[in-house]
């Protein structure tokens, strides 16, 4: 049995969970999330959500822990929310935002303008002498990770000088340059 899958999910106060016809809906103060599920049985008992697999088939065992984690992330998201911070490391790298539009100067001949989904709140922090930081906040962990990965993908950190867009706290594997 999956160690992750068999542990129950505790529903905090202010969060409602509804299960109907293979669709789970989680509502909270931050928003509402809907997820389709298959091959597992989801039941709500009091202030707990239990995820059980329908059989011991290989596919069902694989999805047991997955759906438990997805539902757990939904519950945490609508109650507390998630945050990701990206740091722009490099000379002349800048970030600014106008509403939900993120404007990035990453050393290309043109600026990159990215329209951010309305579910993700955007904030840019630029302090003199420090690297600019893009702070993303959302109740949907999947969407947040997707947006953050897209921004990071515009200029991935390179291993020699460490220049590029990286997550705050991310440890980069550095390489030594050519020895003269």
UniProtKB/Swiss-Prot annotation:
Protein's name in the database: Large ribosomal subunit protein uL6
Q: What does this protein do?
A: This protein binds to the 23S rRNA, and is important in its secondary structure. It is located near the subunit interface in the base of the L7/L12 stalk, and near the tRNA binding site of the peptidyltransferase center.
Q: State the species of origin.
A: Flavobacterium johnsoniae (strain ATCC 17061 / DSM 2064 / JCM 8514 / BCRC 14874 / CCUG 350202 / NBRC 14942 / NCIMB 11054 / UW101) (Cytophaga johnsonae)
Family label: Belongs to the universal ribosomal protein uL6 family.
| Superkingdom field | Bacteria
Any one Gene Ontology molecular-function term assigned to this protein's record: structural constituent of ribosome
Identify the GO cellular component terms for this protein. cytosolic large ribosomal subunit
Q: Which InterPro entries match?
A: Ribosomal_uL6-like (IPR000702), Ribosomal_uL6-like_a/b-dom_sf (IPR036789), Ribosomal_uL6_a/b-dom (IPR020040), Ribosomal_uL6_bac-type (IPR019906), Ribosomal_uL6_CS (IPR002358)
UniProt key word Isomerase: no
Its gene is: rplF
Q: What is the lineage of its organism?
A: Bacteria, Pseudomonadati, Bacteroidota, Flavobacteriia, Flavobacteriales
One of its Pfam families is Ribosomal_L6
Q: Which residues cross the membrane?
A: none
Q: Which UniProt keywords apply?
A: Ribonucleoprotein, Ribosomal protein, RNA-binding, rRNA-binding
Do the record's keywords include Ribonucleoprotein?
yes
User: Quaternary state and partners of this protein?
Assistant: Part of the 50S ribosomal subunit.
Which Gene Ontology biological process is one annotated for this entry? Answer: cytoplasmic translation
């Amino acid at each position: 049995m999956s160690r992750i899958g068999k542990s129950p999910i505790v529903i905090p106060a202010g969060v409602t969970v509804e299960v109907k016809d293979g669709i789970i809906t989680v509502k909270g103060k931050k928003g509402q999330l809907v997820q389709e599920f298959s091959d597992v049985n989801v039941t709500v008992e009091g202030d707990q959500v239990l995820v059980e697999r329908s059989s011991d088939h290989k596919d069902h065992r694989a999805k047991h822990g997955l759906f438990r984690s997805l539902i757990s992330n939904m519950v945490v998201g609508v109650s507390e929310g998630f945050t990701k911070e990206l740091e722009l490391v490099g000379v002349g790298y800048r970030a600014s935002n106008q509403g939900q539009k993120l404007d990035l100067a990453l050393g290309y001949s043109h600026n990159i303008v990215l329209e951010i989904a309305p579910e993700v709140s955007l904030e840019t922090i630029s302090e003199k002498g420090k690297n600019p930081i893009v702070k993303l906040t959302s109740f949907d962990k999947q969407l947040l990770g997707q947006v953050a990965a897209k921004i990071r993908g515009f200029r991935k950190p390179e291993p020699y000088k460490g220049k590029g867009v990286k997550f705050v706290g991310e440890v980069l594997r550095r390489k030594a340059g050519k020895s003269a």
